[in-house]
């Protein structure tokens, strides 16, 4: 549809990269951007990333131009014409933060050593195990609904629970043993991480949710 109507398609992949497998080239996406602090584990304030389709890697495109987007081979020649890198680097404007890049590189090396297929496969198995465990709790739907799609191809690792009552109390209790995220007014977000969470930890989490629900009976 975008191609037929001469529309440039850009995607915000904020919490997708490192969490969901995607092939931007096969979908002919024009450009995309994402953060790295969460599912790529580079930490708060971590650098972002960009993707630019190779069909846009050309010299005559109108864009913001900066020192670090110029080819390194001619950067210090002080040419009057912008000599862009023929990659996404041609869109870089200024000096990236070196320390943050170092932290990001260390994280990416962990992903590479683990193998991306292994990471995504374990993530799917972990989140499926979590989903099945939560939905098997007796009378869970009296307290919360699972608002994340059940089909693993329609989601990443995060499972969101929409609480019908006592959401802050639930969050307070579960946070004594597990790291989860609370979003007002009544959503608790849970995301088992394949690089360091185990199936046993997911089992313990589901058991704790079950215990808390039973304590309200």
PLM region descriptions:
Residues 1-217:
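Pyridoxal 5′-phosphate
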């Amino acid at each position: 549809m975008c191609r037929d109507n001469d529309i440039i398609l850009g995607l915000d992949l904020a919490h997708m990269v490192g969490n969901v497998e995607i092939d931007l080239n096969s979908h002919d996406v024009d450009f995309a951007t994402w953060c790295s602090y969460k599912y790529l584990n580079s930490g708060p304030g971590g650098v972002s990333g960009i993707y630019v389709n190779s069909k846009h890697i050309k010299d005559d495109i109108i864009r913001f131009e900066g020192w670090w987007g110029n080819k390194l081979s001619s950067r210090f020649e002080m040419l009057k014409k912008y000599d862009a890198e023929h990659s996404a680097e041609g869109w870089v404007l200024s000096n990236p933060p070196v320390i943050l890049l170092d932290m990001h590189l260390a994280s990416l090396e962990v992903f590479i050593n683990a193998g991306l297929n292994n990471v995504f496969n374990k993530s799917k198995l972990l989140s499926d195990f979590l989903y099945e465990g939560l939905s098997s709790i007796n009378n869970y739907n009296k307290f919360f609904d699972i608002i994340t799609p059940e089909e693993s191809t329609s989601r990443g690792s995060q499972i969101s629970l929409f609480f019908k009552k006592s959401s802050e109390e639930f969050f307070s209790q579960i946070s004594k043993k597990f790291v989860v995220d609370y979003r007002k007014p009544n959503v608790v977000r849970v995301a088992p991480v394949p690089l360091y969470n185990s199936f046993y930890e997911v089992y313990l989490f589901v058991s704790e949710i079950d215990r808390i629900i039973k304590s309200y009976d």
